[in-house]
């Protein structure tokens, strides 16, 4: 996608309190774009003034959400609860604050995972169970003695290239999440 913002109604203001340079996210997003990540949030530094009072420099960013102009995956419906329909279009986030969300779970290795899409109102019990099972199967494959096996190891459960891109960008940016 080009470097202009997505046409959407939802945006995120990031305070970057822990980044006094105000450069970490813009640099990470640029590295992400250059690494060929399928979605990288657009962002701009903005000065926020509320009721005439200066509040600081923030980053106005695309919100990470399922949308053709953002994370372009199949939008799940409650009817998508069987067969191939059950397997597609989920947006999850590994997040230490997952326990504060409605749709979340802790993986078999204690990793907190928030289900971002489908929304709390739309996700079904079967869809939640599918996501949790898929995540736990990935963990089992990663931690197994045969983790390098092409058919039973982690490669059969994830897109290794996109995971490595995400990991490297996070490391270069000093992302602690």
Regions found by a protein language model. Give the residues of each.
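Phosphate/dinucleotide-binding and metal-coordinating scaffold of catalytic cores
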Residues: 1-176
